[in-house]
Amino acid sequence: MTGISLLWLWSKRGFIFISYVFLVCFAAVLPIDSIAQASQSSNNALNTFIVVGALVIFAVVCIILIVGRSLYFKSCLQDVPRRYIPSTAIDLPHRGSRELVTQGVEASKQLSTMFIKPKDPVIHPGVEPPERCDDPNIDKVFPEYLNYHSCIKNIADRFKYKGVFMSVDKNKLDIDSTFSDIVREKYIISNENVAVKQNAERLIELYEVLRFSGNPITREQFVYFVELCIYLVEHSLTHHIEEDLTKFPSNTMFSIGEFSTGLQASRIQSRYSAAQSFENDFGENLLNAQLSELLQNKSRIEEERLGRLRRLAGSINESEDEAISSSISRWNTSSGSITNSYSTVVRH
C-alpha cells in the first residue's frame, strides 16, 4: 500500500472512532440528567427506581439483540461448506486477508506434494505390514496382514488342548489348566536345565502381557514370542530324540543333528532301516550298472580287434594265422576272468 492509501485508511478509522466517542458521550447525557432530576424531586425513591429500571431494561434489550445477532450469524455460517475457502472479494473485502488465505493454500499444496509419501515405513502394531509398506532392510518372514493376536491365541490353544507345540510328544494334563500352567509344568517344574527354565518363564510373562494387556502387539514382541516357542520346541525334540537313541545298539552311527529338522522320534528306527535298505540296493544297482558298461565296452573292443585282424588276414601267412588265433584265445580267457571277478563283487 502507498503512503496516500495508508493516510486515507487511518483517517477513516480515526474519524469512525471519534464519532463513536461523541455518540456515547451524547447518549450518556440523557440517563445522567434523568437520574439527577429524579434525585432532586420530592419523590426521590420512586423516580430513581423508574429511571434506573428503564436503563436496566434498555441494557438488557441491547444485550439480547447483540447475542441474538451473533447466534444468527453463526447459524448462517453453518450452511457454508467447511472446505469452502473465502478467496474472492465478495467473501473477503479486505485484500490483505485474501492474500494471506491464498498464500496459505499454496503452502498447503506444496507441503501435500512433499509429504504425500511418508519418509519412514509405516508399521502399525497388531498386524504384519504389506511388503510395499515394510522396511526393506528387514527380511519378510511372516505373511502380509498376519494378525499377531490370533496367531498367539492359536499357538496357546494348540499347546493347551493338544499338549504340544509340534507332534513330538503327548502331555496328559488337566483340561482346566491354562497355557501358563502347562508350560510351567513341562519346562520349569519337571526340568533341570537352567536356560530352559529361564526361557519358559519369559514365555509365560510375555504371553500374559500380549494376551491380557489390551495393547496392540508389536512386531518385536511377536518375533520374540515365536523365538521362545521355537526354542522350547527344539528342546523337546532334542530331548525325545536322545531318549529314542538310547534304544539303538551302541554300534549304530547316529548323531542328534541328523534329526534336527523336525523328525518324529517314534519313526527314527523305521527310517533308519529304510535308509540301510536303500543304501544296499543303491550299491548293488551301481555295481551292476558298472559291470554292464564294462562288458559292453569289452564286446565293442573285441569286435573292433577282430575286424582289424580279418582285414589283415589276406596279407599274412599261416604262421601268423596261428599267432592271431592264440591271441584271440588269450583275450577270451582274460575277459572271462574279468567277468567272474565282477560277479563275485556283486554277490558280496
From Swiss-Prot:
Membrane topology: Multi-pass membrane protein
GO cellular component: membrane
UniProt keyword annotation of Nucleus present: no
Keywords: Membrane, Transmembrane, Transmembrane helix
Cytoplasmic side: 1-14, 69-348
Main location: membrane
Role: Required for growth under high-pressure and low-temperature conditions.
Protein name per the record: Defect at low temperature protein 1
Organism phylogeny: Eukaryota, Fungi, Dikarya, Ascomycota, Saccharomycotina
